């Protein structure tokens, strides 16, 4: 598939300024079409989907596809419509904003040589691993079927059925690589895997569990599924399904995965074996469990290795971002998801935390994140991204200002707490009732400190938790012995630091003139321009 490229100073496609160019634009999408209907029924679990739709009485179903599966989307929708007697709507990804959205159904169908036409084609607001409930609600959908890679974040608005697909994998080869990496059969190993290999984990467990009694294989347990038999779950680790009342094992749940650890042990006592290619899922696991030794097996290349990624170096980079966030005075809270449960709660918590720390905050909802969008707000010192765990870690090298996680922002604001190296990518862990939740008090240290970034003295004009929730019209009793301290507004400081501050007003020098009638019409044609 050919791709049109144009050399420009900014990464903006030339087609963005022409409607005809947008229609004719070809998208470089790595997608292949499944030729056999039988294979499509198996891979996309058509029968399971139909059973869920018919048993629950759903009439409108939204089908969410990533770029890599768009070639099969129309055929899958047709099969579901025919077998479940419902309306199927396609929610398609747009490559994280790198390509212009397709303006019409016919253009989309033409790209993939599809002859069937559906009533609606919507596009995702954020990353394709998250369930886009907003786009589905626009179509009045009653159920979302999410295909392909998924972050398994909890949703609340609509029921979600996950169909991960069945990427090919040689179980025998995988088990051989596992034995080569772990010759000691008594070692404690925790197995994670990409969701697209969930279909073969039962066979892998049967091949390895007799040899490795201390091996634990995680199970995919997404939340938000309609009530239906969880055929994706296997019977491995039976102790994990009956944990209540048992004291021998510890049941853990992270990132939509359940796993059970031995009694009197912690995650740091285990080595982790990951099945899948290099991905956001692997990076998220390595940052979260940074004290564990990771080994990976890639079914595509049939290669395994011990991961030598310097996690400490990555953590040092994140620590640098925390110091940048500590010095920030104006913070932008970027909403990176509208579908993950409790995203509004973490936004409100961040606003309160920033207010107590003496930082001014603004909330931005801008869809898929890119450099150009954030570059429009030069006044912001640092951005906080509220997103799913897999998309919360942003490499800020291309961005003009740092982009940090809610956990990093809280560490930066809480001066009395030192970072131990433990890392949290899931913002749910910061909410009340969770283990990482921090209780804010009014005795937080507000003394000046020396910035590790600039080497200068920094002041944070903190307010109490009570004041953070009050309006500026509240009355307080004045203390007659209080000394006066002045603070220059942050906006004035930023304006004073700019080399160009706007046109000179020349007060008293410019003559006052009578107001006259201006131009009428729109930019395409004003009334005084004629035909």
From Swiss-Prot:
Cofactor note: Binds 1 [4Fe-4S] cluster per subunit. The cluster facilitates the reduction of the catalytic iron-sulfur cluster in the dph1 subunit.
Span list, region Disordered: 222-243
Reported function: Required for the first step of diphthamide biosynthesis, a post-translational modification of histidine which occurs in elongation factor 2. Dph1 and dph2 transfer a 3-amino-3-carboxypropyl (ACP) group from S-adenosyl-L-methionine (SAM) to a histidine residue, the reaction is assisted by a reduction system comprising dph3 and a NADH-dependent reductase. Facilitates the reduction of the catalytic iron-sulfur cluster found in the dph1 subunit.
InterPro entries per record: DHP2 (IPR010014), DPH1/DPH2 (IPR016435), DPH1/DPH2_1 (IPR042263), DPH1/DPH2_3 (IPR042265)
Record Pfam families: Diphthamide_syn
Alphabetized UniProt keyword annotations: Iron, Iron-sulfur, Metal-binding
Protein name (Swiss-Prot/TrEMBL): 2-(3-amino-3-carboxypropyl)histidine synthase subunit 2
Family: Belongs to the DPH1/DPH2 family. DPH2 subfamily.
Biased composition (Polar residues): 228-240
Species this chain originates from: Nematostella vectensis
């Amino acid at each position: 598939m050919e791709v049109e490229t144009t050399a420009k100073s900014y990464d903006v496609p030339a087609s963005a300024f022409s409607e005809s160019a947008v229609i004719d634009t070809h998208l470089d999408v790595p997608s292949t079409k499944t030729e056999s209907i039988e294979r499509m029924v198996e891979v996309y679990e058509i029968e399971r989907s139909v059973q869920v739709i018919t048993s629950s009485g759903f009439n409108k179903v939204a089908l969410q596809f990533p770029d890599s599966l768009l070639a099969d989307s129309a055929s899958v929708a047709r099969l579901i419509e025919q077998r479940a007697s419902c309306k199927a709507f396609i929610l398609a990804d747009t490559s994280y904003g790198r390509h212009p959205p397709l303006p019409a159904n016919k253009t989309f169908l033409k790209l993939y040589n599809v002859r069937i036409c559906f009533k609606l084609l919507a596009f995702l607001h954020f990353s394709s691993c998250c369930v886009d409930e907003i786009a589905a609600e626009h179509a009045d959908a009653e159920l979302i079927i999410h295909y392909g890679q998924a972050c398994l974040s909890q949703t609340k608005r609509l029921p979600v059925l996950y169909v991960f697909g069945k990427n090919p994998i040689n179980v025998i080869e995988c088990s051989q690589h596992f034995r080569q990496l772990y010759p000691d059969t008594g070692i404690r190993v925790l197995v994670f895997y990409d969701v697209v290999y969930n279909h073969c984990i039962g066979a892998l467990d049967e091949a390895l569990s007799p040899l490795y009694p201390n091996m634990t294989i995680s199970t995919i347990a997404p939340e938000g599924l309609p009530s239906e038999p969880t055929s994706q779950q296997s019977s491995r680790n039976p102790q994990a399904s009956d944990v209540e009342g048992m004291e021998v094992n510890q049941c853990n749940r992270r990132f939509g995965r359940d796993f059970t650890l031995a009694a009197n042990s912690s995650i740091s006592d285990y080595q982790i074996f990951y099945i899948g290619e290099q991905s956001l899922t692997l990076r998220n696991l390595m940052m979260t469990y940074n004290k564990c030794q990771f080994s990976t097996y890639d079914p595509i290349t049939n290669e395994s290795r011990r991961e030598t990624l310097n996690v400490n170096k990555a953590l040092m980079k994140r620590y640098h971002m925390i110091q940048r966030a500590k010095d920030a005075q104006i913070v932008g809270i970027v909403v990176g998801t509208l579908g993950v449960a409790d995203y509004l709660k973490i936004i409100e918590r961040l606003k309160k935390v920033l207010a107590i720390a003496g930082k001014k905050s603004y909330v931005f909802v801008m869809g898929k994140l890119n450099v150009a969008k954030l570059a429009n707000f030069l006044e912001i010192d640092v951005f906080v991204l509220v997103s799913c765990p897999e998309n919360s870690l942003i490499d800020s090298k291309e961005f003009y200002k740092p982009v940090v996680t809610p956990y990093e922002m809280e560490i930066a604001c809480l001066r009395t707490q030192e970072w131990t190296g433990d890392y949290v990518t899931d913002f749910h862990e910061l909410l009340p009732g969770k283990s990482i939740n921090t209780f804010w008090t009014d005795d937080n240290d507000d003394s000046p400190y020396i910035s590790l970034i600039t080497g200068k003295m920094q002041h944070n004009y903190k307010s109490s938790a009570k004041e953070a929730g009050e309006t500026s019209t509240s009355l307080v009793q004045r203390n007659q012995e209080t000394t006066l301290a002045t603070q220059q507004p942050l906006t004035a400081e930023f304006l004073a630091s700019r080399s160009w501050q706007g046109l000179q007003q020349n007060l008293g020098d410019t003559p006052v003139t009578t107001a006259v009638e201006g131009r009428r019409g729109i930019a395409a044609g004003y009334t005084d321009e004629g035909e």
